[in-house]
Amino acid sequence: MKKKLGLLAMVVALMAIATGCSETGQPITSKSTGIWNEYFVYPLSQLITYFADLFNSNYGLAIVITTLIIRFALLPLMIKQTKSTKAMQALQPEMVKLKEKYSSKDQATQQKLQQEMMQLYQKNGVNPLAGCLPIFVQMPILFAFYHAIMRTAEIKQHSFLWFDLGHADPFYILPVVAAITTFIQQKLAMAGTAGQNPQMAMMLWLMPIMILIFAINFPAALSLYWVVGNIFGIAQMYFIKGPEIKASKAGKAGGSSK
């Protein structure tokens, strides 16, 4: 259930970006109406503008700084999500045994399976939906930031490094880096689980491809946001799951040397 919700969240996020393009053509201002614009998009647009003014109208640097601020603010939720995922992974062997024990598809057997599953969760203090809540809390914030970048008119009038923020990267460097960092981040996040869930393994490749397509066609400002966010996510995953990944590799190396 939790994995399906996580997959749904990623798909919804991509659909939201794709279907939100019609509104992104409307600049965000203090006169923009609606709860979404007034309380989500406009404040983030103002935050970007504040840092741009602070650094001599450097909107590229402002996007980098604002992205990092948002990521640090969401970090506790990400840590909670990761811990919940690890707790669920630890229960996988027992969950598999229960599914084998109650393999019959009749309603009575399936109800018994659900009861046993809930008892297993309660016994180990695990909430199967705890890892999904952070995803749905983050999505509105990150999507609002996407809108703030796309709808802040001043961003389109400035450049950063080798690219114009209002146009796609002419050298395709940012789209490629965005796709690669998306892949690395997801690879770290799915370490040890992709083989257990074919759907997640599929998303490991699908997400970078879709990000590449979006980044090639969207303004470089959005690609910059993706790259910075992904690099932060990679560092975050390394520090959270790094010891676990190293231990897994050491175990495999030790087993192969025997």
Swiss-Prot record:
Q: Does this UniProt record's set of keywords contain Ion transport? A: no
UniProt cross-references to InterPro entries, sorted A to Z? YidC/ALB3/OXA1/COX18 (IPR001708), YidC/Oxa/ALB_C (IPR028055), YidC/YidC1/YidC2_Firmicutes (IPR023060), YidC_ALB_C (IPR047196)
Q: Which gene encodes it?
A: yidC2
* Gene Ontology terms for molecular function: membrane insertase activity
Q: Which GO terms describe its cellular component?
A: plasma membrane
Q: Which CDD domains match?
A: 5TM_YidC_Alb3
Q: Where is the lipid attached (S-diacylglycerol cysteine)?
A: C21
Give its localization.
Answer: Cell membrane
Q: Where is the lipid attached (N-palmitoyl cysteine)?
A: C21
- A Pfam match is 60KD_IMP
NCBIfam families listed in its UniProt record: PRK02944.1 (NF002803), yidC_oxa1_cterm (TIGR03592)
Family indicated by similarity:
Belongs to the OXA1/ALB3/YidC family. Type 2 subfamily.
| Name this protein carries in UniProt | Membrane protein insertase YidC 2
Summarizing the function annotation, the protein's role is:
Required for the insertion and/or proper folding and/or complex formation of integral membrane proteins into the membrane. Involved in integration of membrane proteins that insert both dependently and independently of the Sec translocase complex, as well as at least some lipoproteins.
Give me any GO biological process, just one: protein transport
Q: Which residues form the signal peptide?
A: 1-20
